[in-house]
């Protein structure tokens, strides 16, 4: 309920990630919670690994909000498909997002010193991106191992920023 109250902010936006197979269910839940869906944004992965099936070279985020809409910061980058490299090599979380991708969305939809909430923070990429873009961050993760990984990554980003 704390997450729901936070997301209920009159100026808050939301961007839950989901697989294309779950998009209708996710969109339905978002609308039932009273959010207005603005766009479905697509992350096109530039460096996917081939498989026996169609490659999963895209992931989707549903950009939605409650209350008054906030305009994005970089109108020149207002397209709905964005290309970023996937994380190559060993990931610390199965759905880990590149920090540059998260920085892009965070910088485009918030201001410095705003607070970003990630109720499913996984390995903490959103938190690291917030540190690197001077945003406050609140994250939740139910898996203790991933919580510890995320905490360590965010603390390391904070220490690095203090040195710069």
Task: State where each predicted segment sits.
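Core catalytic lobe of class I
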Residues: 1-148
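S-adenosyl-L-methionine
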Residues: 151-164
């Amino acid at each position: 309920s704390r997450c729901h109250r936070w997301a209920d902010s009159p100026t808050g936006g939301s961007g839950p990630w989901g697989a294309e197979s779950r998009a209708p269910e996710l969109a339905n839940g978002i609308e039932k919670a009273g959010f207005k869906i603005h766009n479905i944004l697509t992350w096109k992965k530039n460096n996917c690994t081939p498989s026996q099936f169609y490659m999963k070279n895209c992931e989707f985020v549903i950009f939605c909000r409650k209350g008054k809409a906030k305009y994005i910061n970089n109108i020149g980058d207002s397209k709905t498909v964005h290309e970023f490299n996937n994380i190559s090599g060993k990931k610390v979380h199965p759905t880990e997002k590149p920090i540059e991708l998260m920085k892009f969305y965070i910088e485009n939809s918030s201001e410095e010193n705003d607070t970003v909430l990630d109720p499913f923070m996984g390995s903490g990429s959103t938190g690291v991106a917030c540190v690197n873009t001077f945003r406050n961050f609140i994250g939740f993760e139910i898996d203790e191992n991933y919580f510890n990984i995320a905490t360590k990554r965010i603390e390391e980003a904070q220490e690095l920023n203090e040195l710069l």
